[in-house]
């Protein structure tokens, strides 16, 4: 049984990017879909689609994005808040990451959003992961 589906999804994306695969297959979760929406909005991935599988088990296929040199657009993707150690930050604490080159993905009462949106809306929340 898997305890942290978000960490599993991030690891699958990281491993697929290291192998230069075009598509990574993830397990479905509404939170994972929220994280992928932020990654798509910030142009870290090319796209994703939810696929219905057998026995009502859904999967997600993520199209990874690479630059002209066939290097992954995602340099590093790291899980921050974990089931054993939750990390919460206020809006002022998540204002900037990697001098604006990176993104913090935050789960708030307004949904899963990026750090710049959370700062603009003046909401904090659980820091799910960081990407740059």
Swiss-Prot record:
It comes from the Bacteria. PANTHER family: 40S RIBOSOMAL PROTEIN S15A. Part of the 30S ribosomal subunit. Contacts proteins S5 and S12. It comes from Aliarcobacter butzleri (strain RM4018) (Arcobacter butzleri). It holds the Pfam family Ribosomal_S8. One of its GO terms (biological process) is translation. Keywords: Ribonucleoprotein, Ribosomal protein, RNA-binding, rRNA-binding. The gene is rpsH. InterPro entries: Ribosomal_uS8, Ribosomal_uS8_CS, Ribosomal_uS8_sf. One of its GO terms (molecular function) is rRNA binding. One of its GO terms (cellular component) is ribosome. HAMAP family: Ribosomal_uS8_B. One of the primary rRNA binding proteins, it binds directly to 16S rRNA central domain where it helps coordinate assembly of the platform of the 30S subunit. The keyword Cytoplasm does not apply. Belongs to the universal ribosomal protein uS8 family. This is Small ribosomal subunit protein uS8.
